[in-house]
Amino acid sequence: MVCGLADLGQLDSRGNKVADFLLVIDMQSDYVAVGKAYHEELTAAVNDKIASYPSDRVIYILNRFFWERKDRKKKFATGLLLVSSRIFEKRRASCFTNPDLKDFLEENGAKSMEFIGVDGNGCVKASVLAAVKENYQVSVDLSAVGVVNQKKFQNILYKWRSIGVAVEGELL
């Protein structure tokens, strides 16, 4: 059963209930930089959310397209708060296509996760849907999610809510 954060027991630095893990999706210089679709405002919102979690509960997901060379180092967005060395790469939209991430979550007894990052119509969407399919309790903070096509995103938001994803905040 998918349920909201009200069912969780962990508290953040402000005493609010949080998920077992925060997954920061694709906050990298390929997408978040001057001249790109997302910029400092999103990075600041993402940093606020990261700062609210214990550092050992923050997981960063980097996207490496299937055609990109593995020896080319991926760079996080300028100014992104890096509090953890838990970094997993993915080569497809969903972060759950990385078996190492799935193993890590299982080994650490994860039952719930919160998603932030980019894009709500792409990799965040795919990862949220995959997490629900894997029977995790899932939440999304829209104030820390980048969305280029907000009209298209309304359908995704409806789908998330209809399958029990806890949605909070407003898009920037």
List where the protein language model places each region.
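A short glycine-rich beta-strand->turn/loop micro-motif centered on a GG-aromatic cluster
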Residues: 114-117, 135-150
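Active-site neighborhoods of divalent-metal-dependent phosphate/nucleic-acid chemistry enzymes
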Residues: 108, 112, 116-121
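Short beta->alpha junction loops
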Residues: 88-94, 143-146
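Active-site acidic carboxylates
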Residues: 2-89, 102, 107-111, 165-166
